[in-house]
Curated annotation (Swiss-Prot):
Segments for region (Disordered): 19-42
Entry protein name: Conotoxin AbVIJ
Keywords: Cleavage on pair of basic residues, Disulfide bond, Knottin, Secreted, Signal, Toxin
One annotated GO molecular function: toxin activity
Stored Pfam families: Conotoxin
Domain notes: The presence of a 'disulfide through disulfide knot' structurally defines this protein as a knottin. The cysteine framework is VI/VII (C-C-CC-C-C).
InterPro entries, per database record: Conotoxin
Similarity comment: family membership: Belongs to the conotoxin O1 superfamily.
Tissue note: Expressed by the venom duct.
Propeptide, chain numbering: 18-40
């Protein structure tokens, strides 16, 4: 009787896990698509116009001149 009860509980957990993972799979796919779109955004090269929301390529946005610049190292 104990073996049957354990098997029944294991089967219930497996079906519950499978059902809930189906609903979450859609969200995971959307999340990975969003992540991929963020990863493929292009950065702005040196000398191009920028603002506080622009991503400059290994550079920084000089808000005074509003262009991407390479940082000056001493």
């Amino acid at each position: 009787v104990l073996i049957i009860a354990v098997l029944f509980l294991a089967a219930c957990q497996l079906t519950t896990a499978e059902t809930s993972s189906r609903g979450k799979q859609k969200h995971r796919a959307l999340r990975s698509t969003d992540k991929n779109s963020r990863m493929t955004k292009r950065c702005t090269p040196a000398g191009d116009a920028c603002d506080a929301t622009t991503e400059c390529c290994i550079l920084f946005c000089n808000l005074a001149t509003k262009e991407c610049q390479v940082p000056a190292f001493p």
